[in-house]
Curated annotation (Swiss-Prot):
Annotated keywords: ATP-binding, Biotin, Ligase, Nucleotide-binding
Record's protein name: Putative biotin ligase
EC number in record: 6.3.4.15
Record GO biological process: protein modification process
GO CC annotations on file: cytoplasm
Pfam families named among the record's database cross-references: BPL_C, BPL_LplA_LipB
Source organism: Methanocaldococcus jannaschii (strain ATCC 43067 / DSM 2661 / JAL-1 / JCM 10045 / NBRC 100440)
Taxonomic path: Archaea, Methanobacteriati, Methanobacteriota, Methanomada group, Methanococci
Amino acid sequence: MEIIHLSEIDSTNDYAKELAKEGKRNFIVLADKQNNGKGRWGRVWYSDEGGLYFSMVLDSKLYNPKVINLLVPICIIEVLKNYVDKELGLKFPNDIMVKVNDNYKKLGGILTELTDDYMIIGIGINVNNQIRNEIREIAISLKEITGKELDKVEILSNFLKTFESYLEKLKNKEIDDYEILKKYKKYSITIGKQVKILLSNNEIITGKVYDIDFDGIVLGTEKGIERIPSGICIHVR
């Protein structure tokens, strides 16, 4: 997969989107620093130097976006397990978490944008970057966990090898979509939790997460069972 490496940019997702609109597919935009990194619903994603920030563009007619959405975080977890000896997990919808002193802290996040023609998967991982004081309670870097600087290029390379290996197995029917879902659920730290889900219209839904499938989470609420496709998830207990 072609990699376009930039030292500094506002947003890898935005840059990738412009190229995707011109018809470019199956490439990565990698930046050493983002000045306007975006999280879910346009929230700020701090992207200081030292972190791994990249956006991957795939043809949405060639791949099932619902499967890719689950596969990407699985691949990140499987790669990062080689660098840290702590428990790693996925918080719905796509936060990469690590357990530190009985609490989970955020190691990275994923933002997916989808059209009929292409999908952009933006990935940010705290590797060697200094975590800002205002988010130190909830976020951590690999450097802080391991006590040493890690090779970001190696991490990206290992991610791509893992991701492309899974794609090949799916293509050859060595594994199916439901095996990907099963693996995602194995890493999930949201299933079984009491949560608050903030929706894009600012509505908050509270309930217990009974399951996760390709269409989101299955939530038990006061109204009964609801399926929530996406949202910002806060674990209550």
